[in-house]
Amino acid sequence: RDYGTSIADFYTNIWWPDMIALATAHNVQYTGVIIENYEDETDGETERQDDVQRFQYFGNMILHQGGELGYHGYNHQPLSLSDTDYGDALPYKTWTSFSAMEKAMKELMDFGKEMFPETTMSVYVPPSNVLSEAGRKMVPCIPRSVLLPAIIFPATMLMCRSLKWLKMES
C-alpha cells in the first residue's frame, strides 16, 4: 500500500508507532542494533555520523520500553578479510586489513557511547549474519557483548543461525 511518504517518514510515523503498540500489547522488549552508516568503505577510514536525531529517537524509545541496544556494524560490511570469498551469495566487500576492521569497530563503539552514554551495549549481531574467522577474533574486544552462535560455512565465513545466545568470553 502506498502511504505517499518517504521511507524515513514511513518508519518514523507509521511503522514505528505500530511496533511500539505491538510491543506494549504483547509485553515485548526490542533489541536495537546500531549501524553508523551504509557506506561501502573498508579501508579503515571512518567518518563520524552527524545525523544523530534518528539514532537517538529510536534508541531512546527502545530503552524507554525496557529494550536493549547493541552493535551491528560500522557500515554493514561483515567483519571479513580478503581470504573470504562471498561468491555470488552476498554483495559485500572485504576489509583491507584487520586494523581497518578494528578502526571501524572502535568508531562504532565510540559513536554508540556518544549517543547513549549511560547504556551498556549488550549485543553484537554480525551484518547479514556473516562473521569470518578474523571477525570472530574481534568480537571479544566488544565489551560485554553476546553473539548468536554460528555454524561454519564454506569460504571461511560463519553464518549465525541459532536463536540461542552465547556469551562471548574476553
Q: In which residue ranges do the predicted regions lie?
A:
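C-terminal active-site subregion of NodB/CE4 polysaccharide deacetylases
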Residues: R1-S6, R136-K137, C141-S170
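Anion (oxyanion) recognition and catalysis
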Residues: T24, L63, P140
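Metal-dependent polysaccharide deacetylase catalytic core of the NodB/CE4 family, i.e.
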Residues: Q29-S132, I152
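Terminal accessory/targeting
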Residues: R1-R54, N60, E133, K164, ...
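Generic detector of bulky aromatic hydrophobic side chains
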Residues: N13, P17, F111, P143, ...
